[in-house]
């Protein structure tokens, strides 16, 4: 484990020096081929993901190489469970995709060094085996990329490989095709603040509902993520620093016939120990990124 973390850290440190070297070579040749490299990291008070709280304080480094809409990205989460450093839970995601004219499509391979802490034993080979790997397809449309004044986005994510299965009432296994759909809009505020609003749902039973029914009998709400994020960026040459705060409300499982009472329990739930499906979560963070094009 220590070797893995050390190699990852050294790799990121080594790559972070590359953009400036590449810029010098570019200046000498006078040519620009449109290749972009971005390297950086987020320091977060907790790992929040699509309505779930997946851990405590963490460092989340990333490296992205892009060229004419094609991109290859590596992202990692190096954190601690429940605000302690007794059990590290590293994750490494590799994404390859295409982004142009507001359209996005990519495939992500997610790997959990500590096993499969987020997907659990979901029935890989009828639960006789488990895997630390999952794969996810994503398609999205970001109108703000082509019409800056309308920063509306919609994204669809579906798990296509991994421990993503459930057992029905007849003890038969079925692939869940866990799906998360998110709609977002960004608001520019005074003082160069950016407020991002997101609403995410799961349309059927999935990892996001702990493989329980959603929208059943028109009672159970399948809204996984109502998210507000306030951010301020400071741009410098070849880099930017961002500071932000975020709150997230997970409405999954709320009985629509008793919404007032259920939402009234949100604060009480927030005071309890963190868990994956806690209703209300928050975090703060800082981002530092370097970028260069040559």
Residue ranges and their predicted role:
Residues 1-36, 266, 270-275, 292-294:
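Cleavable N-terminal export/targeting peptides
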Residues 69, 145-151, 155-278, 285-294:
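Outer-membrane beta-barrel transmembrane domain signature
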Residues 39-45, 65, 74-78, 94, ...:
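Transmembrane beta-barrel strands of outer-membrane/channel proteins
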Residues 50-54, 83-87, 167-171:
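Short, solvent-exposed loop/turn segments at secondary-structure boundaries
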Residues 72-99, 105-131:
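Surface-exposed loop and membrane-interface regions of Gram-negative outer-membrane beta-barrel proteins
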Residues 23-82, 294:
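Short glycine/proline- and aromatic-enriched beta-strand/turn motifs that initiate or cap beta-hairpins
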Residues 97-99, 140, 233-237:
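A short, structured loop/turn motif at beta-sheet edges
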Residues 33-35, 55-59, 88-92, 99-101, ...:
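Residues that define the transmembrane beta-barrel architecture of outer-membrane proteins
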